[in-house]
Amino acid sequence: GVLDAFRKIATVVKNLV
């Protein structure tokens, strides 16, 4: 769902930082 996509994006952002 939308929340899952947002969570996935948040995880990617965390990995980039």
Curated annotation (Swiss-Prot):
The modification Valine amide is found at V17. It comes from the Eukaryota. InterPro entries: Antimicrobial_8 (IPR012527). It is found in: Secreted. The keyword Secreted applies. The keyword Membrane does not apply. Keywords: Amidation, Amphibian defense peptide, Secreted. One of its GO terms (biological process) is defense response. Expressed by the skin dorsal glands. Its main location: secreted. It comes from Uperoleia inundata. Pfam families: Antimicrobial_8. GO terms for cellular component: extracellular region. This is Uperin-3.2.
